């Protein structure tokens, strides 16, 4: 009997981008058996509801009257998929899409061949698919091109590392073992925290090098320091900085990631004091990290 695949897409006020994403999703050679769309702006007559209803496969529209963020949106969609009996859960957001119609079939074949609990495609720049949407560190070297992920001819899998949640494919049993994203994180860092759980579970996972998911470039946030040997993430938007730094304070306090703390202080200390000459920025980074470490998950502008 063929195992069922439920696609989960989270959206927030991007109906045009969502339509493009769903066009590619519903053109897969291996169609998902069911599509769940979580609308984080699901008040009243949302245009997303009509868009979802018009898809050529079975669908469920989950409109949320509260913006749950990416973390809460994916958690809601994943739990709904599990409750409906999904064997696999395939994730996507509204500002990206699979590179071609073979991505889901390729991921399933890769998971079967290598007995993977989770498999992700490469996440490439939607404007230049030869480049990665986010830089990937391998050892002390940062990779920025998709071709750099292959270290030998014919390599199909990059084991033990995966980008979540853009195009990520999970077995239902994997989600039962590691859980779903943490609602408290809202946005930013929820994928790192899930990746941490995947590693600690001991379950096999990785990146399929024969499949790609296209996403707007996020590399500009990663500022090179020490002649490019390291990077520090600095979003231009203050709200994104709040969630990035606060959540990273929490994530790096968790088992499995505490070993990165010394490097974190070196990178951001250098970035704020040497590169930017911004001691106030460093103190704000410290304040936000402290909020996360103490599990104070309020919104920007609050004391917690």
From Swiss-Prot:
It is found in: Cell membrane; Secreted, Cell wall. It is an enzyme of class 2 (transferase). InterPro entries: Glyco_trans_2-like, Nucleotide-diphossugar_trans. GO terms for molecular function: galactosyltransferase activity; glycosyltransferase activity; transferase activity. Its main location: membrane. It catalyses: alpha-L-rhamnosyl-(1->3)-N-acetyl-alpha-D-glucosaminyl-diphospho-trans,octa-cis-decaprenol + 2 UDP-alpha-D-galactofuranose = beta-D-galactofuranosyl-(1->5)-beta-D-galactofuranosyl-(1->4)-alpha-L-rhamnosyl-(1->3)-N-acetyl-alpha-D-glucosaminyl-diphospho-trans,octa-cis-decaprenol + 2 UDP + 2 H(+). Gene3D superfamilies: 3.90.550.60. GO terms for cellular component: extracellular region; plasma membrane. Signal peptide: none annotated. It holds the Pfam family Glycos_transf_2. Pathway: Cell wall biogenesis; cell wall polysaccharide biosynthesis. Involved in the biosynthesis of the arabinogalactan (AG) region of the mycolylarabinogalactan-peptidoglycan (mAGP) complex, an essential component of the mycobacterial cell wall. Catalyzes the transfer of the first two galactofuranosyl (Galf) units from UDP-galactofuranose (UDP-Galf) onto the rhamnosyl-GlcNAc-diphospho-decaprenol (Rha-GlcNAc-PP-C50) acceptor, yielding galactofuranosyl-galactofuranosyl-rhamnosyl-GlcNAc-diphospho-decaprenol (Galf-Galf-Rha-GlcNAc-PP-C50). Thus, GlfT1 is the initiator of galactan synthesis, while GlfT2 continues with the subsequent polymerization events. Belongs to the glycosyltransferase 2 family. Was identified as a high-confidence drug target. This is Galactofuranosyltransferase GlfT1. The lineage of its organism: Bacteria, Bacillati, Actinomycetota, Actinomycetes, Mycobacteriales.
